[in-house]
């Protein structure tokens, strides 16, 4: 759980090895963001509220491939970080 002085940031990680159009990539990021927000509403509503009140910050990063993305996803799950993987 974040301390009161910490700002929360949603981190969206995309795969660099996929050749998606900008629109498709934006849509996939949107799916992930919505699913994470819904999951956070169930699992940690106070953190979600804090995130929203502080500007709902988001950043987009790249993973080189699926294996790297799976490792990041597993690490996030192990640390009890709200996460969601879009599978298309």
Positions of PLM-derived features:
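Positively charged, small/polar-rich N-terminal and surface patches that mediate targeting and assembly
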Residues: 1-88
């Amino acid at each position: 759980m974040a301390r009161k002085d910490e700002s929360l940031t949603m981190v969206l990680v995309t795969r660099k090895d996929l050749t998606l159009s900008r629109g498709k990539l934006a849509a996939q990021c949107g799916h992930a963001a919505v699913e994470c927000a819904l999951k956070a509403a169930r699992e940690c509503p106070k953190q979600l509220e804090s995130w929203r009140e502080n500007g709902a910050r988001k950043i987009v990063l790249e993973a080189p491939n699926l294996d790297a993305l799976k490792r990041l996803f597993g690490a996030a799950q192990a640390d009890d970080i709200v996460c969601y993987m879009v599978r298309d």
